């Protein structure tokens, strides 16, 4: 009789636990749904810190298959918007590792390039004009190659048009940086260095406005070195580009 009572009590406890677990799962699901809708509204209203708080709550609930990819994507976007680039990058790496074939992986790669553009702008605006030649546009270069790869790998992405605009901006940014270095060499009468840097600019950024200015400094450098034939050829190229 005692054994039967023990089994009966165990069955009641087991059923109670099963019901409790089911109710807890349902509660978490309802809570996560509520928080997810709330954070979507917060993102729309640009309340990014509130959105991050709610998204992290959902993530910490460890809900199985509850829009985990969307939660991570929204977190990446929110961290990017509040300029928490390190955390955004960390989440990007986690996303790429977990969802390498995701339908919206192009969005993740595009945001990654935007983070590097933002990091470059942050550094660029903190550098005095006289010190620009000393700065290293590492993030601009990184973003440039990321976007080139992006445009090649995802030609049909909805972000391609913006990516091409960003590439145009980066070409201008990097060509002007190189031109600043070239000017520094010129004013210090390092004419060979001017010519070498000029050739690099013309090779990398031939379609930019910096290319014409580069030719002018190269022409002056060849004249200073008394290499008149080459200076004359460059002068003709400059005139042709004015037409």
Swiss-Prot record:
One of its GO terms (biological process) is protein insertion into membrane. The keyword Membrane applies. Residues 1-21 form the signal peptide. Coiled coil: none annotated. Keywords: Cell outer membrane, Membrane, Signal. It is found in: Cell outer membrane. One of its GO terms (cellular component) is cell outer membrane. Part of the Bam complex. Belongs to the BamD family. NCBIfam families: OM_YfiO. Part of the outer membrane protein assembly complex, which is involved in assembly and insertion of beta-barrel proteins into the outer membrane. This is Outer membrane protein assembly factor BamD. It comes from Buchnera aphidicola subsp. Schizaphis graminum (strain Sg).
């Amino acid at each position: 009789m005692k054994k039967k009572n023990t089994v009966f009590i165990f069955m009641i406890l087991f059923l109670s636990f099963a019901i409790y677990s089911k109710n807890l799962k349902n509660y978490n699901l309802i809570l996560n749904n509520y928080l997810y809708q709330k954070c979507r509204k917060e993102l729309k209203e640009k309340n990014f810190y509130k959105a991050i708080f709610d998204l992290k709550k959902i993530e910490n609930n460890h809900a199985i298959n509850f829009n985990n990819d969307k939660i991570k994507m929204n977190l990446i976007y929110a961290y990017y918007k509040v300029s928490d680039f390190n955390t955004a990058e960390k989440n990007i790496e986690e996303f790429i590792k977990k969802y390498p074939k995701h339908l919206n992986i192009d969005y993740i790669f595009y945001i990654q390039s935007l983070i590097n553009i933002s990091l470059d702008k942050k550094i660029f605006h903190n550098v005095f004009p006289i010190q620009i030649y000393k700065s290293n546009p590492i993030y601009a270069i990184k973003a440039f190659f990321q976007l080139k790869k992006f445009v090649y790998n995802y030609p049909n992405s909805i972000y391609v048009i913006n990516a091409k605009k960003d590439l145009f901006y980066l070409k201008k940014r990097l060509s002007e940086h190189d031109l600043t270095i070239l000017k520094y060499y010129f004013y210090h009468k390092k004419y060979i260095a001017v010519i070498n840097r000029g050739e690099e600019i013309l090779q990398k950024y031939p379609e930019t406005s910096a290319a014409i200015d580069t030719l002018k400094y190269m022409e002056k450098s060849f004249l200073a070195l008394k290499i008149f034939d080459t200076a004359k050829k460059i002068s003709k190229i400059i005139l042709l580009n004015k037409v």
